[in-house]
A protein has these predicted regions:
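Secondary-structure boundary elements
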Residues: 169-175, 200-208, 244-257
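Hydrophobic/aromatic-lined pockets within catalytic cores
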Residues: 57-62, 187, 200, 215-218, ...
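Short catalytic/ligand-binding loop motif for oxyanion handling, primarily in non-cytosolic enzymes
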Residues: 65-66, 75-76, 219-220, 271-273
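Non-catalytic protein-protein interaction segments used by genome-maintenance enzymes to assemble
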Residues: 174-176, 181-233
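Metal-dependent nuclease catalytic regions and adjoining charged, substrate-binding loops involved
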Residues: 95-103, 228-233, 238-344
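Metal-dependent nuclease catalytic cores that hydrolyze phosphodiester bonds in DNA/RNA
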Residues: 1-193
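Short regulatory "switch" loops immediately downstream of catalytic or recognition motifs
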Residues: 157-166, 201-203, 241-250, 283-284
């Protein structure tokens, strides 16, 4: 089972050119421009919180990276904080002094109050010099608030003890749990990668189960909407087929089966009951080849078609229009397939 873990660093895994679920989903959601743009979300509070919950539940050995923010001075607003964090990055990367010109350049980059005078922008940042120094002094840690830590602890405890989720963490004899499993495989002719939050292997019943952990700002009963919005179905289908390929190629596990894919969701505000969204395995093929939601007559593109389009855009270096537009040579027709009357 150890060989399921890639013999590479986390950075190497991130930098590989294999397609990830997030890149494929971003393309389907935002179009080809998403293939050449990368949003820096590393400093966003919801990203930090999600990572904290992941580490508490799945990788407690990483908790040394976190430190409670005990700064007692006046805290900057979120917009000024973004500028200050960028200033810290500049100092750490260059080792240079933070001049007024650098502050103005960062303010411009961050679209920080464009109508403010230059002197006002500089003063707004310099006002929090003590806070900037505090961040620099703790540069080796991910600073979090006491509230964030406490909520994360409660979420982890709920997941570990609630009846619907406990079974994936309080394992029985003959079961094994593997956290943060990184895989790179081929899928339908393309190289793909996936970071599996948790795999539970039952050697008695000869099964695998994939569990993915999600956190977010929406309430528990709204997660199903997030499932469609953020294309989590792509993740379920891709990861299922990736694991299927790996175990099919391993003599030790060739007679094991993969159970339904499971998402566990907890809102960042905490909840008494975890949201468990199960993707029945017989739906994976539909997600691959195209599918309808409910009684809608609109057919969504499947994973195979989406990856095919992504590969086309990379190969042809076209990112401003869709491959469908190029294949049609820019020509469209409104016919009976798009518009129907009552008697048609």
């Amino acid at each position: 089972m150890d060989r399921f873990r890639l013999s590479c660093t986390e950075e190497q895994f991130r930098e590989t050119k294999a397609l990830s679920y997030s890149r494929i989903a971003s393309y389907d959601k935002d179009g080809p421009i998403a293939l050449i743009t990368k949003k820096d979300l590393s400093g966003k509070s919801y990203i930090i919180f999600g990572k904290l919950v992941d580490d508490m539940l799945l990788s407690p050995q990483n908790l040394y990276k976190y430190k409670i923010n005990n700064y007692n001075g006046e805290l900057p607003s979120s917009s000024i904080s973004d500028v200050i964090n960028e200033c810290v990055e500049f100092i750490l990367k260059t080792g240079e002094e933070l001049t007024d010109n650098v502050i103005l350049e960062i303010c411009e980059k961050k679209d920080f109050y464009k109508r403010w005078k230059k002197e006002t922008k500089i003063e707004a940042v310099r006002k929090y010099q003590d806070y900037l120094d505090f961040i620099l002094e703790n540069k080796d840690y991910q600073l979090i608030t006491p509230f964030m830590w406490n909520v994360a602890e409660k979420i982890v405890e709920t997941i570990k003890t609630y009846p619907t989720t406990k079974k994936w963490f309080d394992l029985l004899e003959g079961q094994e749990g593997f956290n943060q499993v990184d895989l790179i495989t081929e899928y339908n002719g393309s190289l793909v990668k996936g970071a599996f939050d948790r795999l539970v292997v039952d050697h008695v019943n000869k099964t695998f189960q994939i569990i993915d952990l999600k956190t977010g700002s929406v309430q528990s009963d709204e997660f199903i909407d997030q499932f469609w919005k953020f294309r989590y179905w792509i993740q379920a289908a891709l990861y299922y087929r990736m694991l299927e390929k790996v175990i099919d190629e391993d003599e030790q596990y060739k007679d094991y089966e993969i159970l339904d894919f499971v998402f566990i969701y907890m809102p960042s505000s905490g909840a008494k009951i975890p949201t468990v969204l199960t993707i029945e395995r017989d739906r994976i093929e539909a997600f691959e080849n195209g599918f309808y939601i409910g009684k809608s007559e609109f057919k969504h593109k499947g994973l195979k078609q989406i990856i095919k389009e992504v590969e086309w855009h990379y190969e042809n270096q076209v990112f401003d229009v869709s491959c469908d537009f190029m294949n049609r040579d820019g020509s469209y027709v409104i016919d009976c397939n798009q518009v129907r009357s009552d008697d048609e």
